[in-house]
Amino acid sequence: MATWNASSPAASPCSSRRRTKAPARRPSSESPPPRKMKSMAEIMAKSVPVVEQEEEEDEDSYSNVTCEKCGSGEGDDELLLCDKCDRGFHMKCLRPIVVRVPIGTWLCVDCSDQRPVRRLSQKKILHFFRIEKHTHQTDKLELSQEETRKRRRSCSLTVKKRRRKLLPLVPSEDPDQRLAQMGTLASALTALGIKYSDGLNYVPGMAPRSANQSKLEKGGMQVLCKEDLETLEQCQSMYRRGECPPLVVVFDPLEGYTVEADGPIKDLTFIAEYTGDVDYLKNREKDDCDSIMTLLLSEDPSKTLVICPDKFGNISRFINGINNHNPVAKKKQNCKCVRYSINGECRVLLVATRDISKGERLYYDYNGYEHEYPTHHFL
């Protein structure tokens, strides 16, 4: 009779023999010794709150910051800290005055890389404003007289109610004086890294031109009449010839860049159109540009448009605003911003509201439509 061998390859699969314990692991000099791991709860229970300590240290280090100009530490809500040197400055102590707390990074005058204002040559000034050649004086006089005759012939003989008409700008007669006036504007724009623009710009990625529809204006928008439209077109052609209103851009240590009359300007004279990039207001809510102008105020906030003269602009961005909280400062207003519907699109025009004498600075109300701009620090 044959006997059964358990080690034989022909062993029965029904055998009840099984391995109940793994063999002991052989020690190896290469493998590290076993480590006991702690749970995350045990680690967090014994950890030190480093972040909170840093925040407390930061608060303590900034609690004694004082203004570098006046030496006072009062008015924490108006004390700006330079993001580079950590020195403090009151907004009203800075020159020029800062009217609102910057949203992004802010650098003091010593740490900022400000471009020095430099004078430009005649060739560079003409190239900056894209003026090809000065028209001869007699040709200009004949052209203006011909335009006047055409406008007189187009007038109706019927008696109408007297209306305040928009007047065309009157440039200085001396061409050298006009060149010097344009030179001050070119130097100011160059110092801020802004390119000259005589119209609205529609940049890809911002608001398209199709979004600029005056019919979307909340409550409606006044339409520029035909006669005033002819005056506007006449002034725009004069701008392209280098015939600008008698204005110069000067730098004031308190107010920054300001616009000053270099000759007399009559009431209701067209000064300039507010120009720049057109964008949706929702895209500029965290923008530090202090010269944003409302173009279209829509019932739907997502369709409200603004003009942003941070990359392209003209002399209109340098005209300062009045202090709405000071009755005396309100008397300085001598021009206004008016929004018109022109060919179904919104446009913003700057117009004189009274006679302006030579040497007088130009001011208008920044809060003419919306009371959103802080002017309590204005002079």
Swiss-Prot record:
It is an enzyme of class 2 (transferase). Disulfide bonds: none annotated. Expressed in leaves, roots, stems, flowers, siliques and developing pollen. Up-regulated in tissues where cell division is active. GO terms for cellular component: chloroplast; nucleus. Its EC number is 2.1.1.369. It comes from the Eukaryota. It is found in: Nucleus; Plastid, Chloroplast. S-adenosyl-L-methionine binds at residues 255-257, 317-321, 366, 373. One of its GO terms (biological process) is pollen development. Its main location: nucleus. Keywords: Chloroplast, Chromatin regulator, Metal-binding, Methyltransferase, Nucleus, Plastid, S-adenosyl-L-methionine, Transferase, Transit peptide, Zinc, Zinc-finger. PANTHER family: SET DOMAIN-CONTAINING PROTEIN. Isoform 1 but not isoform 2 interacts with PCNA1 and PCNA2. Interacts (via PHD domain) with HTR1 (via N-terminus). Isoform 2 interacts with IPS1. This is Histone-lysine N-methyltransferase ATXR5. It comes from Arabidopsis thaliana (Mouse-ear cress). The gene is ATXR5.
